[in-house]
Amino acid sequence: MDTFSLKDNIFLPLVLSGFRYDEMNERLKPIAAKLNITDILDKYPYEVSGGQKQRAAVARALITKPKLILADEPTGALDSKATGSLLRLFENINDEGQTIVMVTHSTKAASNAKRVMFIKDGEVFHQIYRGNLTEEEMFAKISDTLTMIASQK
């Protein structure tokens, strides 16, 4: 919402749930630090870049500590540094027990996942499980699968 500061936008789900202001601030501090948005929390959406808006949206999703996070193209508006930071944050969150379902067209983003599902014509076409694969090996498997899918058209 353009009439709310980034901080107020992030707080919105907590306000609607009846949290006290001090509780909201305590939740926000570590998330804002991890997403590198502490210095812009008092700015309005029209005053920040697309990537900064994206990181504020991620903070709003994380502040409620959900068991399931739905992320639709979360790295789409981010530069490579911010993308890497967000993917590491998602990995840490996932390691703490939260499930993340991410829709992405980015092979780089997908190569960080534990499981990648390829959907074609509304059905699961192929799956890759990470297992012990490195990020580079996972990237290669995803790229090979995308090549296979493209050659079948």
What do the predicted segments below correspond to?
Residues 4-12:
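Short coil-to-helix segment of the ABC ATPase nucleotide-binding domain corresponding to the Q-loop/switch region
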Residues 23-35, 145:
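ABC nucleotide-binding domain "signature" region
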Residues 44-48, 52:
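Conserved ABC ATPase signature
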Residues 58:
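Hydrophobic anchor residue at the start of the ABC signature
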Residues 63-67:
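A short, proline-enriched helix->beta-strand linker immediately N-terminal to the Walker B motif
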Residues 69-72:
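Catalytic Walker B motif of ABC-type/P-loop ATPase nucleotide-binding domains
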Residues 123-147:
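Conserved beta-strand-loop-alpha-helix hinge in the C-terminal portion
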